[in-house]
């Protein structure tokens, strides 16, 4: 990898239940680029992980839940200065276990948010594009967003 052009692989998942998405309000870390934003759960790949491995680990770490039914919905390429991030975007509607609301306490606060209210929250502008695609139930999509 060219050190002048670093790449990052991440996952993000929106758990769905009763017309709501499980959202993480990122309020804990002060120097967090997502500070005060509402996002799904997920994170960075660890060494040797596949997108699915990362998804399952991150959801379990941040929620206490083990996913049983999930779907890769798209790949979002973020251009952030010299960094390129490839985010594998998932939704899930099946899991086992009980939600541990403070599992993500190092990241923020977990809340179930009605899908109709998500775009009124402080979210990234680009996220509004993929929220629309998720609501339209597009089978798969790819986006490129520059910040």
Label every model-predicted segment:
Residues 1, 73-79:
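Short, solvent-exposed loop/turn elements at beta->coil junctions and helix N-caps
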Residues 1-23, 44:
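Conserved N-terminal beta-strand and adjoining loop/helix that marks the start
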Residues 8, 35, 40, 67, ...:
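Short connector loops at helix/strand junctions that flank enzyme active sites
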Residues 133-147:
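Charged phosphate-binding loop/patch that engages nucleotide di/tri-phosphates or the phosphate backbone
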Residues 16-20, 29-30, 46, 92-98, ...:
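Short, charged/polar surface micro-motifs in flexible loops or helix N-caps
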Residues 45-68, 79-133:
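Unchanged
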Residues 21-57, 61:
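Conserved Nudix-box catalytic region and its N-terminal flanking loop in Nudix hydrolases
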């Amino acid at each position: 990898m060219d050190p002048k052009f670093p790449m990052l692989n991440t996952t993000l998942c929106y758990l769905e239940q009763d017309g709501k998405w499980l959202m993480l309000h990122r309020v804990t870390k002060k120097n967090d680029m997502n500070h005060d934003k509402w996002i799904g759960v997920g994170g960075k790949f660890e060494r040797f992980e596949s997108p699915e491995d990362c998804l399952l680990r991150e959801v379990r770490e941040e929620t206490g839940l083990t996913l049983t039914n999930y779907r890769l919905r798209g790949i979002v390429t973020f251009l952030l200065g010299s960094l390129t991030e490839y985010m594998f975007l998932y939704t899930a509607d099946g899991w086992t276990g009980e939600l541990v609301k403070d599992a993500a306490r190092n990241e923020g606060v977990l809340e179930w948010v009605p899908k109709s209210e998500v775009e009124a929250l402080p979210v990234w502008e680009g996220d509004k594009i993929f929220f629309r695609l998720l609501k339209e139930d597009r089978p798969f999509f790819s986006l490129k967003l520059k910040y």
